[in-house]
């Protein structure tokens, strides 16, 4: 992907952005250019907003999640925006919604339940769009709500720009059901754009659809400085964890997430069993809960890992950030994962991160720099990557804020995203 935009005093007012979308090989060049041009890019959008009214944006999204807050706040700053959520919490898991809403820079609104009990049949969107008269609408994935937006566009406002946010990994995109493929075809044809969270998926879309200018890239990430401040504030709790679990001198592996089948956690324990004799100081912290917890505890005991595995339960807020501070090597072993927002959190916390190749968040890993990738079907592959990480990992000595391991910052990604977006909506 490459972006060229104007720098001279006269050219700063132009709206003719040149955007082309390519694969991962050129992502580094793009984002490094965003680093050099960061001030110019921000000033360009600032001037554009000063001379022109902000465009009206309506966002329809399933729920408020911690890994979306910064993105929503950025949209709210860039547009005259209003946000409607379908549910009071994320369906698959529960978050502390009161604290999350305290981080929002806007007032959230919530849609009425779906008609006839169908969750995405939200006919209320018609009255909202008639009232708000937006220039741009964001929605999520491929579903009935998105089709309702198209009906409104066809009947009342052909100029309406509609974008959907799709979290699919490449594997999920390739294995889509017939119904999803049909919905995706309609969206690609009639929407203004699709926001993808993985650059390999973007390349896949470009290859399979003749509409490359419609595909935008923005991973699921949080603001570096804000998240790292949360980590810093959690350091006293981290020191308590060090004492509670006797972690000093141990090589601390970390998993954060639900203890469910798709996370592939028996596989992780089996891979750990292959290396633990060579690295007897290794200890794996499971932070999360789920229906496999008891079975995982028994599996760890049967495989001689009782002294090398700790089940901490589900944690949120400061209690969760404290675990990122003590973790040295983070592992996401999922065999099915749309993205994996925990990878961004682990990298921001300075954890060397081992990520399954099927997770969308694999795009955040720079092998041999901030982590590595592995095949979630090969125990020996993960065991080798664990051994490499442990070989370079000293035991935990001092609880402190580790260096950020994200390759690029939130600001770099969001500037690039808004330049892509503005090239489409004008």
Question: What is each of the regions a protein language model found here?
Answer:
Residues 189-239, 247-248:
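Donor nucleotide-sugar binding/catalytic pocket of nucleotide-sugar-dependent glycosyltransferases
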Residues 367-368, 372-379, 388-393:
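Conserved acidic donor-binding segment of nucleotide-sugar-dependent glycosyltransferases
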């Amino acid at each position: 992907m490459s972006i060229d935009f104007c720098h001279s005093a006269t050219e700063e007012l132009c709206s003719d952005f040149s955007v082309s979308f390519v694969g991962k090989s050129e992502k580094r060049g793009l984002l490094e250019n965003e680093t050099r041009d960061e001030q110019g890019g921000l000033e360009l959008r600032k001037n554009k907003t000063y001379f022109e009214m902000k465009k009206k944006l309506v966002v329809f999204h399933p729920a408020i999640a911690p890994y979306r807050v910064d993105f929503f706040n950025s949209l709210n700053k860039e547009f005259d925006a209003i946000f409607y959520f379908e549910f009071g919490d994320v369906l698959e898991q529960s978050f502390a919604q009161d604290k999350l809403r305290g981080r929002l820079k806007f007032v959230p609104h919530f849609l009425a339940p779906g008609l006839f009990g169908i969750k995405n049949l939200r006919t209320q969107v018609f009255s909202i769009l008639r009232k708000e008269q937006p220039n741009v609408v964001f929605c999520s994935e491929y579903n009935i709500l998105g089709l309702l937006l198209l009906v409104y566009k066809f009947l009342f406002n052909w100029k309406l720009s509609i974008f959907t946010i799709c979290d699919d990994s490449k594997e999920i995109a390739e294995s889509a059901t017939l119904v999803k493929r049909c919905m995706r075809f309609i969206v690609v044809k009639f929407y203004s754009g699709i926001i993808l969270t993985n650059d390999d998926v973007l390349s896949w879309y470009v290859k399979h659809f003749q509409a490359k200018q419609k595909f935008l890239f923005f991973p699921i990430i949080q603001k570096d400085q804000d998240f790292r401040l949360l980590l810093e504030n959690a350091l006293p709790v981290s020191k308590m964890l060090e004492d509670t679990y006797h972690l000093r001198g141990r090589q601390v592996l970390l998993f954060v997430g639900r203890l469910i089948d798709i996370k592939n956690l028996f596989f992780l324990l089996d891979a750990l069993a292959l290396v633990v004799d060579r690295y007897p100081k290794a200890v794996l912290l499971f932070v999360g809960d789920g229906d496999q917890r008891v079975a995982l505890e028994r599996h760890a005991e049967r495989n001689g890992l009782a002294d090398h595995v700790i089940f901490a339960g589900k944690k949120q807020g400061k209690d969760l950030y404290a675990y990122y501070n003590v973790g040295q090597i983070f592992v996401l072993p999922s065999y099915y994962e749309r993205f994996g927002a925990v990878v961004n959190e682990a990298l921001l916390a300075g954890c060397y991160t081992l990520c399954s190749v099927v997770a969308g968040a694999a795009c955040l890993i720079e092998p041999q720099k901030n982590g590595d990738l592995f095949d979630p079907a090969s125990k020996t592959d993960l065991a080798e990557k664990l051994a490499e990480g442990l070989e370079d990992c000293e035991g935990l000595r001092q609880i402190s804020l580790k260096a950020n391991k994200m390759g690029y910052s939130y600001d770099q990604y969001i500037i690039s995203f808004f330049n892509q977006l503005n090239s489409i909506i004008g």
